[in-house]
């Protein structure tokens, strides 16, 4: 007898089929199958076969032992394709739910592992991998041939093992037939190539078992063929049989033959010698199932019920018998009859099983007796040898399974598992849609994603031009280790290309790409949706549908083996189901698919007999009968599915024996008889479950009928937009599809809808995707109805809208001529149709609005209901928590009781310990172990305590660090607060100093300068030239000497007023590296012209040339320009070796624009893209700005008066963001050099009034944008400005003129626009009328010139008609203002001027400008001496009183008056200063009157007593004394580093005799205390005290003033030296304050009071003047005395004067 054992494993496990009668022993290579099903099968676990696939896979062995049949190649292809097609049709469904099924499969794999470990007691430690040894293989072969198996073996404790039972029939598994087969479907030609290549290779791949075709072998070889496949981990091989299906008529005849011969009909693998030659030979192998049996509540069971409905509808649609709804009752009755037959046959099941056991035992004893088995020479010819490519684990890190390969890489097999293979192919499919995965490899483009994992990483690409594969590093490590081919450069050939060459196979990549691009083609392997899976009752229902079409012979055979015929019919039903899972009508291979389906429907099982089985049967017939063998006749045992709707597995045993046999029964027979009662109990439970499933089937049928009534044909349901192959399951899907279709149509009506509509469309798509992912667990009936109605309305509206659009296009297409030729009725037809459609559209739109409102209300109501449900759930949760708390209290009470019991037990344990002494040595070992564990416990406790201590120490350290950190933080915060206060104090004291220096100290300095100038004019003593004076001196003073006649004679003397005002010229050679095209005007040759002009003045000693200025600090560049603009400018330069320049423009955001255009250089600037940049342009621009900053340092700190910067590129058109908003371009400019220099001067040198004069022919719009609104700067520009803005840049209309009402200028911008081709007269008139007065009113401290010489009449720009003499004149005008107000400080920066080729106008203009700038006339020098060198006789009124209201004139600039204490302090000090000044003036006035009287008296006495000789002696003495005195007089030192003749009075010691006349009571103590003033640009603070005696003890810088009090009451006018050895003598200048006090003239408006004005203050004390750059000292002539004994006058006040002239 033969039995078939069904072994369950993973989905891709290869099932070995062994026919004991045919001696085909197959040892499977199943790595994951650890089950030992020998003697451990149970009918109670038949539901474990739910996932078995009965269709033959391409991976299964084909054991077609048909001796007389000849199978053609076409039939063989059909054989190969028949099983896989059923499985593939439903793979698409599985792919859509891959995420859920992957989780289920992982859980099933874990459950399978547990089940296999429990089931296989003979496996050593549950080992999973490894090949069995030769001994184990032989043992397995012996057991598979001789060991009988009972269908159900129970364990001694009465439990049933987890794995499932045996089956003598290859029953088609209806549900598992619908299980997904991951093997890709191949076409006929591909399958033939695959079979031929595998047979020629002699082995199998990782996914393909050896495919053996019996047609290629002799008849005898087919009978004795043995396929031995090594099963690595299956220690006990199980035996199964295959069912070779044939036509149904032949199958029934064979069954009848077997019955007449009294053989066992359960052996279905008998050879049929009478088969026709055209029969299809199918070998349907049972694929092993995976996982534990599913329960009714699992997700897979829910899917099965849904799939059942689809399957029934599909079969009804393809069969006339099942499509009629009236036949449903007949079908149900047939199912009931089948259930009753199964229940009746249950009683006879055990007898057949027992007889089967007996037969198997007899066969085992026969072989034990030493009878050899027949073996053929082809036994191991097709032995399945493990492939050398079988590498594990999976390429995914951490995955241990590898039973698959990526379809995209075949024939190169990369080990992977199902989960990661699907995920990888999904990622590669997405990359294919994005374009990262190449569609056509012949293009030579390489992939951007890995061909194994699908990730976008760094790839190693194949060197073959026809291969686009690339692999990442992680995947290369595994694949290279497998194939021994590491990437070694650009010529590396990948593994896929190698295997294509060696195996001569086709690449799978092209087919896979076509599948993804054309998913509807059935010839391309693709994953279809999984079809419905059927439970037991549904399978029987479909079986009886097929039985109605069978012949009477089949019906008779089905009485013996109903399950067998049902299973054969299930194959046909599976074929029908394929039509529902995938519609082949849309495929180009429709006829071929229908042909295959028809073949499968007509196919049936054939029974074949082998020689061994025939011989064995004859031996059994000749043996005498046995009493124990007569148990029953033709008993059919059917086992139905268990709970959860398992698949029916029938174990059919037909026992027909006559007589008795002397052979004793096997020992297992008794065990089988004892288990019959338990089997009947389980069978009854299954029948009850079948009844319940029958009720479910009825409900599904009713639901199906209802859907057909509502929706018509099931196959014509609405197709989902997001998943076209998926049928909508609820109204939400229908609603989403209808709305999406409507939105998609409406969006096509307008190409540019409003932004609001676009946003709504985007939000709609986002919401639609979210709703599609929601799984509705609750039933919202009202919402569903409203949604369905709204969907229908939307559909109607969409149709009507489409019709309206079509009608509109139709009406629009009609031409007027056609309408005129048509009749009235003909013209009205389309109009009436359009009106009708519009009316219907409006009506539908109104209904949609109402329906939307009602749907919204229904949704709100449903939300409220859901919220109430949530509240109920929360309430239930609270109740559960309360119950759990009560339970926990109860449990805690029980725990306490248990602990009490434990304590009692411990006491008893102690008692038993006293008895341990009396025990044997074994007890001592126990005590030793206890002691050891206790020591370990103590050690661990000690370690834990130490760790706790360490943890506490760490916590303490952390707390200390936190405290320390907080304290430091608090300290830093206090310091920051203090620094902020200091900043506020510094700002306050600065503005206080600024104010008082302007209001008080400046007045005092001014009065002192006026008085000194008066005294200078009164001195008549001749002063010779100093050694270093210049030769060109002019006589401007006279000296009074005594003549021979004793009368005073006035002699003219020469005083050196020719001062050295030095000029510095700055340029850098990098400025020439700013490259522009040859046609451009702003060329590097302009710098060569300017430098050549500078070199002409190199011989002048007053001119210095500096050719290496540093780059400007980027901080000052950022103070002028936007940081983003500078960053874009630095990153937008062309490469270093580029032959082309780049056009550069920018908007306000700093974005660069490159345009292939250039400026029209012949005249107007029509084209706006005129600025070019090269690789070194930014370096040149930074050096240019650095030159201007170096000029500021030279003028402010290095003793130079003027500076000229020959730089490029120009900058006065560059605004804060590059191009200004009102200009068309940047006008050749990159960064604004003049603006950067002005900001630099303001920030570093402390200038508060800086004037920028731009006389370029183009308006300096960039400089105006940067400096506008800042009171520290004044910008003046004279340029060409047309009304129509034709001339570049079109900006700079007249602005900034004086206000006629207020007489003041408005703002800090003065623009003077000239008409084009204006001449010199108008140009110079504008300078005299507007520019010079504006500068006079502003009184700048520093002047910048944007020197643009493109206004010349010969310049290519043709803007103005000026000459080079005009630039000479305006430069002289600027110098005049500079000498008057800013000590001659001028910085000239080259801007425009492009006449360098023909006219050479630039050279002439620069020469004129430099000549006027460098060479000083006598009038200019005299103006400089008057302005800030000599003391002019300006008469001012009395010093004004201090007013606290004028303390802060501009709150926005100087801050708010928020510190009252500071204001009060300053107010008190200034009041004291006012009082001191008033008292000092009054006292000095009285003293002056007395001194004048005394001098008059002394002069009269001297004239009367003096003789002619004495007069000559006195004259010589006075001249000598005067000469000696002038060498030591108070001089004004300059900061010129080159002048060696400067006299620095900072370190001079003035020994002034303070003559305290005891008779003079008018001397004030204030006269003995000098007051220090420093008149630098950054003025110090005038500090006073509250002393009413006005004692100001201030010492000057390193000046030691020794006032010796000589008590000389008689001669107060003599000058006395305190140190007789000192050769120097000081000049005591009489202070005449009467002229100042009596002068009532108003102040001169040309010399207003300012911190930097020349005449500062009235207190004759220590004065430090800034900004006078002179190499020769100015000599102050003392006033001669009329007395012969008094060559010089003396100041009665004894106030010394130390005049220190230092620059900033």
UniProtKB/Swiss-Prot annotation:
<feature type="compositionally biased region" description="Basic and acidic residues">
    <location>
        <begin position="608"/>
        <end position="620"/>
    </location>
</feature>
<dbReference type="InterPro" id="IPR000286">
    <property type="entry name" value="His_deacetylse"/>
</dbReference>
<keyword id="KW-0963">Cytoplasm</keyword>
<dbReference type="GO" id="GO:0141221">
    <property type="term" value="F:histone deacetylase activity, hydrolytic mechanism"/>
</dbReference>
<dbReference type="InterPro" id="IPR023801">
    <property type="entry name" value="His_deacetylse_dom"/>
</dbReference>
<feature type="region of interest" description="Disordered">
    <location>
        <begin position="1485"/>
        <end position="1704"/>
    </location>
</feature>
<dbReference type="InterPro" id="IPR037138">
    <property type="entry name" value="His_deacetylse_dom_sf"/>
</dbReference>
<feature type="compositionally biased region" description="Acidic residues">
    <location>
        <begin position="97"/>
        <end position="113"/>
    </location>
</feature>
<dbReference type="InterPro" id="IPR011011">
    <property type="entry name" value="Znf_FYVE_PHD"/>
</dbReference>
<keyword id="KW-0539">Nucleus</keyword>
<feature type="region of interest" description="Disordered">
    <location>
        <begin position="540"/>
        <end position="634"/>
    </location>
</feature>
<feature type="region of interest" description="Disordered">
    <location>
        <begin position="1"/>
        <end position="303"/>
    </location>
</feature>
<comment type="function">
    <text>Responsible for the deacetylation of lysine residues on the N-terminal part of the core histones (H2A, H2B, H3 and H4). Histone deacetylation plays an important role in transcriptional regulation, cell cycle progression and developmental events. Histone deacetylases act via the formation of large multiprotein complexes.</text>
</comment>
<feature type="binding site">
    <location>
        <position position="1165"/>
    </location>
    <ligand>
        <name>substrate</name>
    </ligand>
</feature>
<feature type="compositionally biased region" description="Low complexity">
    <location>
        <begin position="222"/>
        <end position="286"/>
    </location>
</feature>
<keyword id="KW-0378">Hydrolase</keyword>
<feature type="compositionally biased region" description="Polar residues">
    <location>
        <begin position="70"/>
        <end position="81"/>
    </location>
</feature>
<feature type="binding site">
    <location>
        <position position="1256"/>
    </location>
    <ligand>
        <name>a divalent metal cation</name>
    </ligand>
</feature>
<dbReference type="GO" id="GO:0046872">
    <property type="term" value="F:metal ion binding"/>
</dbReference>
<feature type="compositionally biased region" description="Low complexity">
    <location>
        <begin position="1677"/>
        <end position="1698"/>
    </location>
</feature>
<feature type="compositionally biased region" description="Acidic residues">
    <location>
        <begin position="196"/>
        <end position="210"/>
    </location>
</feature>
<feature type="binding site">
    <location>
        <position position="1350"/>
    </location>
    <ligand>
        <name>a divalent metal cation</name>
    </ligand>
</feature>
<feature type="compositionally biased region" description="Basic and acidic residues">
    <location>
        <begin position="186"/>
        <end position="195"/>
    </location>
</feature>
<keyword id="KW-0479">Metal-binding</keyword>
<dbReference type="GO" id="GO:0005737">
    <property type="term" value="C:cytoplasm"/>
</dbReference>
<feature type="binding site">
    <location>
        <position position="1258"/>
    </location>
    <ligand>
        <name>a divalent metal cation</name>
    </ligand>
</feature>
<feature type="compositionally biased region" description="Low complexity">
    <location>
        <begin position="540"/>
        <end position="549"/>
    </location>
</feature>
<feature type="binding site">
    <location>
        <position position="1227"/>
    </location>
    <ligand>
        <name>substrate</name>
    </ligand>
</feature>
<protein>
    <recommendedName>
        <fullName>Type-2 histone deacetylase 2</fullName>
        <ecNumber>3.5.1.98</ecNumber>
    </recommendedName>
</protein>
<feature type="compositionally biased region" description="Basic residues">
    <location>
        <begin position="372"/>
        <end position="382"/>
    </location>
</feature>
<feature type="compositionally biased region" description="Acidic residues">
    <location>
        <begin position="354"/>
        <end position="369"/>
    </location>
</feature>
<dbReference type="GO" id="GO:0040029">
    <property type="term" value="P:epigenetic regulation of gene expression"/>
</dbReference>
<feature type="compositionally biased region" description="Polar residues">
    <location>
        <begin position="1649"/>
        <end position="1669"/>
    </location>
</feature>
<dbReference type="InterPro" id="IPR023696">
    <property type="entry name" value="Ureohydrolase_dom_sf"/>
</dbReference>
<keyword id="KW-0156">Chromatin regulator</keyword>
<comment type="similarity">
    <text>Belongs to the histone deacetylase family. HD type 2 subfamily.</text>
</comment>
<dbReference type="Pfam" id="PF00850">
    <property type="entry name" value="Hist_deacetyl"/>
</dbReference>
<keyword id="KW-0678">Repressor</keyword>
<dbReference type="InterPro" id="IPR013083">
    <property type="entry name" value="Znf_RING/FYVE/PHD"/>
</dbReference>
<feature type="compositionally biased region" description="Polar residues">
    <location>
        <begin position="315"/>
        <end position="325"/>
    </location>
</feature>
<feature type="compositionally biased region" description="Low complexity">
    <location>
        <begin position="1491"/>
        <end position="1616"/>
    </location>
</feature>
<dbReference type="InterPro" id="IPR050284">
    <property type="entry name" value="HDAC_PDAC"/>
</dbReference>
């Amino acid at each position: 007898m033969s039995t078939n054992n069904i072994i369950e494993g993973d989905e891709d496990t290869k099932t070995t089929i062994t026919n004991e009668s045919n001696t085909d022993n197959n040892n499977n290579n199943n790595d994951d199958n650890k089950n030992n099903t020998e003697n451990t099968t149970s009918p109670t676990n038949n539901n474990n076969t739910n996932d078995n696939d009965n269709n033959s896979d391409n991976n299964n062995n084909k054991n077609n032992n048909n001796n007389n049949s000849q199978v053609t190649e076409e039939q063989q292809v059909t054989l190969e394709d028949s099983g896989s097609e059923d499985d593939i049709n439903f793979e698409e469904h599985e792919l859509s739910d891959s995420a859920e099924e992957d989780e289920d499969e992982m859980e099933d794999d874990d459950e399978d592992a547990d089940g296999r470990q429990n089931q296989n007691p003979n496996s050593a430690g549950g080992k999973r991998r490894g090949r069995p040894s030769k001994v184990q293989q032989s043992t397995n072969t012996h057991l598979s041939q001789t060991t009988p198996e009972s269908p159900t073996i129970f364990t001694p404790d009465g439990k049933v093992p987890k794995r499932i039972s045996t089956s003598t029939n290859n029953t088609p598994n209806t549900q598992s037939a619908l299980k997904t087969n991951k093997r890709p479907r191949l076409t006929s030609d591909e399958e033939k190539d695959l079979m031929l290549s595998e047979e020629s290779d002699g082995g199998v791949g990782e996914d393909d078992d050896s495919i053996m075709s019996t047609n290629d072998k002799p008849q005898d070889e087919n009978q004795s063929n043995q396929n031995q496949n090594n099963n690595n981990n299956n220690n006990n091989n199980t035996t199964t049989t295959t069912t070779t299906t044939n036509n149904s008529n032949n199958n029934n005849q064979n069954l009848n033959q077997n019955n007449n011969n009294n053989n066992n009909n359960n052996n279905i693998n008998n050879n049929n010698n009478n088969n026709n030659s055209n029969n299809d030979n199918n070998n349907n192998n049972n694929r092993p199932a995976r996982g534990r049996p599913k329960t009714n509540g699992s997700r897979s069971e829910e899917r099965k019920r849904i799939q059942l409905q689809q399957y029934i509808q599909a079969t009804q649609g393809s069969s006339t018998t099942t499509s009629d709804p009236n036949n449903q009752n007949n079908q149900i009755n047939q199912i009931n009859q089948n259930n009753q037959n199964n229940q009746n046959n249950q009683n006879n099941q055990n007898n057949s099983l027992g007889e089967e056991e007996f037969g198997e035992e007899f066969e085992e004893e026969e072989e034990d007796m030493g009878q050899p088995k027949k073996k053929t020479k082809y036994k191991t010819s097709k032995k399945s040898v493990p492939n050398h490519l079988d590498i594990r684990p999976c390429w995914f890190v951490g995955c241990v399974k590898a039973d698959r390969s990526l379809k995209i890489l075949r024939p190169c097999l990369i080990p992977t598992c199902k989960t990661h293979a699907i995920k990888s192919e999904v990622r590669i499919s997405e990359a294919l849609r994005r374009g990262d995965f190449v569609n056509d490899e012949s293009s030579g483009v390489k992939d951007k994603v890995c061909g194994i994992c699908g990730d976008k990483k760094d790839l190693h690409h194949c060197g073959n031009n026809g291969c686009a594969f690339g692999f990442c590093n992680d995947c290369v490590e595994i694949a290279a280790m497998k194939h021994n081919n590491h990437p070694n450069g650009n010529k590396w050939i990948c593994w896929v290309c190698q295997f294509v060459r060696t195996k001569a196979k086709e690449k799978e990549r092209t087919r896979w790409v076509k599948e993804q691009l054309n998913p509807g083609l059935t010839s391309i392997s693709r994953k279809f949706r999984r079809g419905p899976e059927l439970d037991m009752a549904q399978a029987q229902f479909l079986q009886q549908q097929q039985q109605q079409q069978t012949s009477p012979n089949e019906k008779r055979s089905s009485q013996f083996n109903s399950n067998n015929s049902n299973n054969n019919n299930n194959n046909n039903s599976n074929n029908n189901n394929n039509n529902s899972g995938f519609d082949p009508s849309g495929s180009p291979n429709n006829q071929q698919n229908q042909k295959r389906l028809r073949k499968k429907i007509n196919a049936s099982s054939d029974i074949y007999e082998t020689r061994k089985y025939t011989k064995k049967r004859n031996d059994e017939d000749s043996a005498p009968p046995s009493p124990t063998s007569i148990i029953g006749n033709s008993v059919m045992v059917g086992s139905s599915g268990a709970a959860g709707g398992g698949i029916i597995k029938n174990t059919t045993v037909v026992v027909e024996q006559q007589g008795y046999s002397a052979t004793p029964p096997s020992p297992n027979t008794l065990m089988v008889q004892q288990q019959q009662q338990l089997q009947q109990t389980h069978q009854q439970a299954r029948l009850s479950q079948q009844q319940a499933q029958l009720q479910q089937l009825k409900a599904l049928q009713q639901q199906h009928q209802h859907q057909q009534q509502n929706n018509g044909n099931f196959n014509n349901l609405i197709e989902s937009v997001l998943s076209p192959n998926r049928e909508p399951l609820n109204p939400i899907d229908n609603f989403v599809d209808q709305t999406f279709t409507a939105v998609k149509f409406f969006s096509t009506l307008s190409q540019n809808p409003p932004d609001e509509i676009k946003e709504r469309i985007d939000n709609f798509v986002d919401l639609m995707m979210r709703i599609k992912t929601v799984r509705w667990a609750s039933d919202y009936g009202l919402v569903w109805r409203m949604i369905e109605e709204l969907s229908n309305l939307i559909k109607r509206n969409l149709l009507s809208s489409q019709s309206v659009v079509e009608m509109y296009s139709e009406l629009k297409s009609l031409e007027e001529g056609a309408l005129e030729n048509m009749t009235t009725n003909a013209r009205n037809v389309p109009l009436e149709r359009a009106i009708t459609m519009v009316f219907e559209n409006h009506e539908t739109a109104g209904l949609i609005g109402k329906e939307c409102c009602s749907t919204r209300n229904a949704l709100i109501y449903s939300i409220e209901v859901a919220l109430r449900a949530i509240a109920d759930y929360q309430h239930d949760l609270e109740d559960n928590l309360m119950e759990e708390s009560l339970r926990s209290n109860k449990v805690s009470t029980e725990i306490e009781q248990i602990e009490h019991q434990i304590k009692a037990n411990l006491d008893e344990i102690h008692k038993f310990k006293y008895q341990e002494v009396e025990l044997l040595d074994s007890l001592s070992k126990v005590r030793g172990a206890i002691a050891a564990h206790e020591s370990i416990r103590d050690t661990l406790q000690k370690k834990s305590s130490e760790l706790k201590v360490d943890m506490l120490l760490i916590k303490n350290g952390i707390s200390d660090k936190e405290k320390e950190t907080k304290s430091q933080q608090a300290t830093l915060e206090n310091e920051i607060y203090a620094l902020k206060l200091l900043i506020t104090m510094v700002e306050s004291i600065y503005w206080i100093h600024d104010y008082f220096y302007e209001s008080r100290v400046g007045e005092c300095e001014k009065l002192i300068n006026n008085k000194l100038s008066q005294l200078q004019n009164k001195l008549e003593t001749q002063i010779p030239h100093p050694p270093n004076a210049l030769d060109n001196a002019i006589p401007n003073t006279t000296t009074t000497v005594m003549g021979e006649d004793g009368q005073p004679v006035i002699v003219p003397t020469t005083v050196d007023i020719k001062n050295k005002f030095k000029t510095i010229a700055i340029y850098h050679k990098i400025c020439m590296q700013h490259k522009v095209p040859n046609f451009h005007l702003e060329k590097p040759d302009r710098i060569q012209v300017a430098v050549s002009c500078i070199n002409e003045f190199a011989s002048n000693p007053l001119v210095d040339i500096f050719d290496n200025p540093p780059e400007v600090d980027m901080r000052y560049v950022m103070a002028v320009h936007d940081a983003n603009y500078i960053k874009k400018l630095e990153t937008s330069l062309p490469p270093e070796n580029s032959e082309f320049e780049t056009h550069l423009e920018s908007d306000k955001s700093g974005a660069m624009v490159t345009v292939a255009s250039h400026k029209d250089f012949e005249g107007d600037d029509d084209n706006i893209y005129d600025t070019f940049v090269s690789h070194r342009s930014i370096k040149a621009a930074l050096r240019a700005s650095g030159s201007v900053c170096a000029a500021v340092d030279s003028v402010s700190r290095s003793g130079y008066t003027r500076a000229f910067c020959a730089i490029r590129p120009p900058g006065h058109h560059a605004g804060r963001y590059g191009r200004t908003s009102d200009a068309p371009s940047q006008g050749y400019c990159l960064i604004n050099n003049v603006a950067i220099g002005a900001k630099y001067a303001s920030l570093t040198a402390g200038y508060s009034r800086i004037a920028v004069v731009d006389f370029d022919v183009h308006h300096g719009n960039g400089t105006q944008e940067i400096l506008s609104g800042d009171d520290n700067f004044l910008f003046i520009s004279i340029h060409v400005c047309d009304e129509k803005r034709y001339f570049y840049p079109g900006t700079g209309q007249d602005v900034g003129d004086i206000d006629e009402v207020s007489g003041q200028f408005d703002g800090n911008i003065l623009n003077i626009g000239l008409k084009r081709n204006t001449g010199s007269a108008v140009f110079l008139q504008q300078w005299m009328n507007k520019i010079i007065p504006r500068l006079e009113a502003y009184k700048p401290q520093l002047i910048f010139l944007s020197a643009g010489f493109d206004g010349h009449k010969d310049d290519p720009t043709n803007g103005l008609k000026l000459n080079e003499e005009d630039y000479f004149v305006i430069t002289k005008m600027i110098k005049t203002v500079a000498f008057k107000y800013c000590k001659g400080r001028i910085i000239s920066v080259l801007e425009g001027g492009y006449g360098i080729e023909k006219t050479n106008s630039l050279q002439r203009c620069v020469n004129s400008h430099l000549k006027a700038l460098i060479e000083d006339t006598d009038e200019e020098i005299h103006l400089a001496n008057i302005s800030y060198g000599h003391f002019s006789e300006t008469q001012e009124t009395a010093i004004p009183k201090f007013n606290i209201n004028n303390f802060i004139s501009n709150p926005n600039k100087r801050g708010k008056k928020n510190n009252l204490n500071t204001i009060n302090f300053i107010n008190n000090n200034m009041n004291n200063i006012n009082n001191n000044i008033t008292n000092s003036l009054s006292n000095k006035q009285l003293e002056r009157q007395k001194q004048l009287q005394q001098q008059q008296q002394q002069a009269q006495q001297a004239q009367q007593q003096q003789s002619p000789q004495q007069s000559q002696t006195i004259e010589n003495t006075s001249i000598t004394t005067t000469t000696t005195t002038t060498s030591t007089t108070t001089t004004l030192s300059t900061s010129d580093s080159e002048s060696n003749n400067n006299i620095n009075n900072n370190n001079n010691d003035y020994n002034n005799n303070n003559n305290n006349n005891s008779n003079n009571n008018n001397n004030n103590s204030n006269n003995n205390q000098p007051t220090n003033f420093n008149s630098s640009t950054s003025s110090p603070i005038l500090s006073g005290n509250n002393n009413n005696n006005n004692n100001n003890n201030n010492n000057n810088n390193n000046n030691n003033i020794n006032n010796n009090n000589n008590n000389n009451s008689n001669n107060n006018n003599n000058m006395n030296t305190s140190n007789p050895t000192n050769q120097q003598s000081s000049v005591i200048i009489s202070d005449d304050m009467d002229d100042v006090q009596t002068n009532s003239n108003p102040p001169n408006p040309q010399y207003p009071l300012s911190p930097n004005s020349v005449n500062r203050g009235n207190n004759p004390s220590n004065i430090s003047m800034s900004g006078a750059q002179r190499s020769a000292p100015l000599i102050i002539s003392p006033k001669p005395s009329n007395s012969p004994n008094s060559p010089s006058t003396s100041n009665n006040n004894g106030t010394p004067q130390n005049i220190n002239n230092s620059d900033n």
